[in-house]
């Protein structure tokens, strides 16, 4: 063989090696159609491939997605869908999953132009509202499975979804609207009960502002109100929580009265009768003219902000978190306005159905967590949803066969600072493995480990309605949360609009 021939063979071998990740590029491109535009195909580590694709199911819809596909030799057979956060508009980093051998997909929920791009701050048109509410995640998944079939020549063995806040809502929506998409879903601090959570924000704003929109409390006063419950309960709470966090922040009315008297002693400026009335309203929530519960009220100890304290929460956030369609609240939103603007449209973005029968029937499993210090997606609305779900499905025992809820003490939302943990910082591979064990082997998670670094502890959180505590003998024990501790919002706030 001549030198020229030898060189040609070597170059051909190098080219083949360099393009091995693209061996099925032609097959991948066959997935493109009138809805799916393939924007880019490229390499990831260890001979893997990424595909950037945009979905446009109707005019005005532009859903950006990415899937990362490990090499056939490394693929675990699993697809993981990854949730977004806030209002979406970005593609998150998927390396942690694809490097572990999983096919993994995510989406910007179709909101990039309105959240990060040339239309930033503009009202969402109906097509984008629909994408964000339910369509983007489903279509991302449909096409992700097509890319998997094209790349590997076979379907995924199992499909899982994980997400928190907005991503948790995505997971709920998948289980409720598209139960065939995923076998197991891990939804932490889900922003799912959007209308009910929006009511909490409206109530907090109304209690902390006058009718002109003027703030009635200082930041220091609200910080005192957020921190006082820990000191108030330190001699009566159970181990290991006493003096650090609340084991159970669902205070009955008499306990709230005692707390407010304690707050007045802590900060005499909060002894004013009008401020006392408003602080009680923060915790006791609101009812309509017929006596129906609009919202439970914020939990004592709810944290938001760094280093901590209860925030004012703006009426602007009310509209942004639920509507994002040009609707805005007045300076002092009334409950009539809430009904008109949030309830009327909120069913489209709610992910709070009490019918998970199709998901459960096909063997789907849903693991949910919520945080006692979460002021952004308040725990009472999630607990209320789960209690309604249990009543609809024959009790907690039956419901726990397909859906388990784990309330986490000391957990705050992203952007805040929880006394034990914040947002997804508490979600580890151990939780994903627990979901996998439940789906594939039928071994349901009996605990949700919550790391408490400050005390060098890991709390073995049991599924609701149980809670864990340390006995005097130093061993973990469980007890049931009190019945009827939640002032459950009216069921109509949990309704989902049909597609």
Identify the residue ranges that each predicted region occupies.
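Catalytic-loop region of hydrolases
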Residues: 22-78, 90-92, 227, 233-327, ...
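Cap/lid segment of the alpha/beta-hydrolase catalytic domain
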Residues: 76, 86-153, 199, 328-341, ...
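Short beta-strand/loop motif that positions the catalytic acidic residue
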Residues: 368-370
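Short glycine-enriched nucleophile-adjacent loop
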Residues: 168-179
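Active-site nucleophile loop of the alpha/beta-hydrolase fold
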Residues: 186-195, 407-412
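Bacterial N-terminal signal peptides
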Residues: 8-18
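Alpha/beta-hydrolase fold nucleophile elbow
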Residues: 154-165
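N-terminal cap/lid subdomain of alpha/beta-hydrolase-fold enzymes
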Residues: 56-128, 135-138, 165, 207-209, ...
